[in-house]
Amino acid sequence: MRIVFVGTPEFAAEILEHLIKNGFNVVGVVTQPDKPRGRGRKVAPTPVKAVAEKHEVPFIQPESINKKEALEFLRSVRPDVIIVASYGKILGEKVLSLPRLGCYNIHPSLLPKYRGASPIQRVLENGEERTGVTIYKMVKELDAGPIALQKEISVDPFETFDQLEKRLIELSKEMLIEFLEKLKTGNIELKEQDHSRATYAPMIKKEDLIVDFSKDAESVKNKIRAYDSRPGARAFLGNVEVKLFGVTAIDSSGDEPGLINYIDREGAWIGTGDGKVKVRYIQFPGKKKMTFWEAKNGRLIIEGMRFERRYES
């Protein structure tokens, strides 16, 4: 079975690496163009490109997978199936109709819930207790195709984005191998999604990152862990925008929203609308992430200071 893999970030790269190491015939890769990354804004290859180069798999990086040059590449490698994981761009009908077995997407949510670009973050932000991975046959509509395989896992109360993403990558690897073995033998049963139950996970905007400490402690906890460690939840100390990481506890005893009540080696207790949360790490502009205790000892922060919310979603 000839496979073309389409993806961009680390989530997709780990799945591609797993496919190749398990002996599957990956005949081509499509990933997004290289972009400036990190503090120095140096142009770096996408994680998927790095895997393709490592294993000498032919790859392209088109601005659009739907343009003539990309379609010619896809036709030239003659895929039986196209596997998509976190590509970040829409596949048009010409691409979807190209492989004889179809195009299948690996989506890290329990579809039809959380269709869209940011399912892991939205699951955490909304305090969901369960999530999972869905492999579905792609259609023109976003994340709306019939389901080939779906498995679920529980979400731990203080689990961060990084931690949950790692578990979902491992689940995706296992599921993709199972799916491809079934596809080889024609043993795939597709189940239509219940579109009436669809919810959406839109792309993250900068205002989504801002913590509103006037909300309840559970909501504040969920906001911070949803963006831990990247790109980091934001709050303001005076005119300074900082990032917050590592919520370790919540408490129902009241305090003023945003007020830094107490700092010890384990973190800072910060007031919310109905209690307080304990946050371990803070990052100031141009500095590395540090504990609140380190920030206090460095005279960057003291008890009695207050976090604010500066722009509205």
Curated annotation (Swiss-Prot):
GO terms for molecular function: methionyl-tRNA formyltransferase activity. Its EC number is 2.1.2.9. GO terms for biological process: conversion of methionyl-tRNA to N-formyl-methionyl-tRNA. It catalyses: L-methionyl-tRNA(fMet) + (6R)-10-formyltetrahydrofolate = N-formyl-L-methionyl-tRNA(fMet) + (6S)-5,6,7,8-tetrahydrofolate + H(+). (6S)-5,6,7,8-tetrahydrofolate binds at residues 109-112. Pfam families: Formyl_trans_C, Formyl_trans_N. Keywords: Protein biosynthesis, Transferase. PROSITE patterns: GART. SUPFAM superfamilies: FMT C-terminal domain-like (SSF50486), Formyltransferase (SSF53328). GO terms for cellular component: cytosol. HAMAP family: Formyl_trans. Attaches a formyl group to the free amino group of methionyl-tRNA(fMet). The formyl group appears to play a dual role in the initiator identity of N-formylmethionyl-tRNA by promoting its recognition by IF2 and preventing the misappropriation of this tRNA by the elongation apparatus. Belongs to the Fmt family. This is Methionyl-tRNA formyltransferase. It comes from Thermotoga maritima (strain ATCC 43589 / DSM 3109 / JCM 10099 / NBRC 100826 / MSB8).
